[in-house]
Amino acid sequence: MKQEPHRQSEEKEKPKGPMAVEREHHTSLSSGTTMTASTGDESTNSRPVESSQTEKSLSLRIRILKQLGFDDIQELNACDTGLVEQFLNVRLINDTKELEKIRESNLAKLNQIIDKCMESDKISDSTLNKILDMSMNRDTNNDNNNHLTIPSPITTKKRKINASELASPRGHRRYRSDIPTVSEVETGVGYPQIHQQPGAYTLPMPANQWMSNPYMQPPQPQVQQIMPQYLYPPGMGPQAQLPTMSSNSESQTPVMSSQFLSLNQHGLYQQNIGAHPVMSMGPQANIYGQQHQPQPGQERDQSRKSFSHRRSQSANISMANFRSPMRNPQPASSQRPVNFLIHTPKHPPPT
């Protein structure tokens, strides 16, 4: 019976709460070895730091909840971090909605003011434009101050395109699409077109003053004589007369007959230029209207072809010995073949 009041007195002397439990644990460990005592000291040093951090975070959350409008914080769990974040998001959404309402009200007021200014005669349009320009400049300045100016690739490209052409000699580039097209009517210059109209065929006429010197006669183009098919019926047209060869015909060329008179009388050279005549060649006619005959100069030189020079053979050209029937209907005299070879001491003329 004496031991029970002693136990009750010991229980009264013991403090209550978590701190008392820690003290009892500490006293119990202190009775052990030295190692257990040292570990107990480290745990007591770390726990006060953690408790201080948790107390600070709780105080901040309580303040935030009070600012959000929650007075009865005891009903909420302040230790729950997700709950506080949700309340913060709701507060941000409400603030943005209020800002939008204020902006809409300001715009409505501005519209009313502008309408009244337009209706009144005292305020002119120039003053309104000045006010609008001032507001626009203020907005642009605010945007430039708030945002960083970063050069975009679009602006750099425009600067390169609009750069001056004097920077480099290769800067001036013109394309075919940039060159304006000019018509022939504006310039007054007409370019010849192919096959516009058929041309009239004329025969060459050699010069009389060059008949004496065979080496000074100019070369004449060989013009093809065209026999019209529609002027004469078959078998009734003029026939080409063949020349007769004599013993001394080495230096003579065949003489044309007077068929040009009959052709001229029937109107060979008086055809319509704009028409397209149908013409054909005779079966046995060459470019001069005669039968092809070997040249006598070539027959004479067959025996000494191996001894003569090559240039002397290719330079002999027989010229036409007749005039145009339009100018001189009489047959012209015969002439020698023309040699256009330029003779030198190294290459003398043929003998």
Curated annotation (Swiss-Prot):
Cell cycle keyword on record: yes
What subcellular compartments does it reside in? Nucleus
One GO cellular component, as annotated: nucleus
Family that this chain belongs to:
Belongs to the POG1 family.
Name of the featured protein: Transcriptional activator POG1
**Highest classification ranks of the organism:** Eukaryota, Fungi, Dikarya, Ascomycota, Saccharomycotina
- Give the organism, scientific name: Saccharomyces cerevisiae (strain YJM789) (Baker's yeast)
Superkingdom to which the source organism belongs: Eukaryota
What function does the entry list? Answer: Transcriptional activator which promotes cell cycle recovery with CLN2, after pheromone induced G1 arrest, probably inhibiting the ability of STE20 to activate the pheromone response pathway. Binds the promoters of genes that function in cell cycle regulation, cytoskeletal organization, and spindle assembly. May also be involved in stress-resistance.
Q: Which UniProt keywords apply?
A: Activator, Cell cycle, Cell division, Mitosis, Nucleus, Phosphoprotein, Stress response, Transcription, Transcription regulation
Q: Which residue stretches does the UniProt record annotate as biased composition, category Polar residues?
A: 28-56, 241-256, 287-296
